Swiss-Prot record:
One GO CC annotation: plasmodesma
Organism phylogeny: Eukaryota, Viridiplantae, Streptophyta, Embryophyta, Tracheophyta
Source organism superkingdom: Eukaryota
Coiled-coil regions listed: none
Example of a GO MF term: O-acetyltransferase activity
Name of the protein in its database record: Protein trichome birefringence-like 39
Length: 367
């Protein structure tokens, strides 16, 4: 004996009403469940995300470089002819847990109305553009405003009011032009006024501290009231980072601003660092595999570690040095736009800086 609704319009109305209600409810529950899953994934990250190994993953890279409008030519290795693809496919796998997956919508919703500023040299540019591409891959049709000025760039995702800023500074401490010439002031950080009022700050410095001769951007270093034609670069780095730490202690309100420091990014100009003394990063197609990187821990890392331990305000140290040392294959090398020579200090995009941002994302939302 069958059941029929023929001739009963009120039944049809309530049937379709409850059907629609169930569909909407299922959608809401699904969205809520997805957000809950992201939260659980982030909250579960109670391990050392910075110790692990690189694994090949066919699902990588996390975005298409041809569809991201923010990549500078010097980082867009595929566009400028890099023939191999394996360097795009490596995912960082921590030893005792899994690194949370990046969710661009979750990031935008959690950071709605906030300002995130990267402060540092061209490696900060590397990381800023990476984060912009990661987010854009989730909302490719959303409206954005990109403004580039000398020393400062900002990218705003309009619908969410999220702004990614980049403040370019080679040393964090001040570099001024005076009567005697260009003076690197190891105990002055007046430019820090530009960093105040941010919701998140991500700092970086080291790359330029080692430059000499014609690529050295200063003529004198100033410490106190004394000028120096030069000094041990590690000593200078320590003095500069100590000045930065004093600025953090004096001006950062942890209830309003989260502070990160992206650690020392290694170079791969010297093949002896990984047991190939005749080579550099050029033509490298695989990461270094081994229990310990032969090049050892950079002294800059030791200095940065010392400075971090003396901070009175909370700063999240993204300790990317060890995992980045393994990626001798991930540099632009000869595929760096119109930049001549062999670039073994910056990184291809997509590439290693995406992992830096996964670590930033994981730390930001689990802290």
């Amino acid at each position: 004996m069958g059941f029929t609704s023929r001739g009963n319009p009120s039944f049809l109305f309530f049937f379709f009403f409850f059907l629609c209600l169930s569909t909407v409810s299922a959608y809401i529950n699904s969205t809520s469940s997805n957000n809950d899953e992201v939260r659980r994934e982030l909250a579960s990250g109670r391990c050392n995300w910075f110790r692990g190994n690189w694994v090949y993953d066919v699902k990588y890279p996390l975005y298409d470089p041809y569809k991201c409008p923010f990549i500078d030519p010097q980082f867009n290795c595929k566009k400028y002819g890099r023939p191999d693809n394996a360097y795009l496919k490596y995912r960082w796998q921590p030893s005792s847990c899994s690194l949370p997956r990046f969710n661009g919508l979750y990031f935008l919703r959690r950071m709605r109305g906030k300002k995130i500023m990267f402060v540092g040299d061209s490696l900060s540019t590397n990381m800023w553009q990476s984060l912009a591409c990661l987010i854009h891959s989730w909302v490719p049709n959303t409206r954005y405003t990109l403004i580039r000025q000398k020393g400062l760039a900002s990218l705003t995702f309009e619908e969410y009011g999220v702004t990614l800023l980049l403040y370019r500074t080679q040393f964090l401490v001040d570099l001024n032009v005076e009567k005697v010439g260009r003076v690197l002031k190891l105990d002055s950080i007046k430019q820090g006024n530009m960093w105040r009022g941010m919701d998140v700050l991500i700092f970086n410095s080291w790359h330029w501290w080692t430059h000499t001769e014609h690529i050295q951007p200063w003529d004198y270093m100033e410490d106190g009231n004394r000028l120096y034609k030069d000094m041990n670069r590690l000593v200078a780095f320590y003095k500069g980072m100590t000045t930065w730490a004093r600025w953090v202690n004096a001006y950062v309100d942890p209830s309003k601003t989260k502070v990160f420091f992206n650690g020392v990014s290694p170079t791969h100009y010297e093949g002896k660092d990984w047991g190939e003394p005749m080579n550099s990063c050029r033509s490298q197609t695989q990461p270094f595999y081994g229990r310990k990187y032969p090049g050892g821990t950079p002294m800059a890392w030791v200095i940065l570690n010392k400075v971090m331990r003396r901070l009175k305000k909370p700063v999240h140290w993204l300790d990317i040095t060890g995992l980045s040392q393994l990626r001798k294959d991930a540099h632009p090398s000869a595929f760096s736009g119109n930049h001549p020579g062999n670039d073994c200090s910056h990184w291809c995009l997509p590439g290693l800086p995406d992992t830096w941002n996964l670590l930033f994302y994981s730390t930001l939302f689990s802290s």
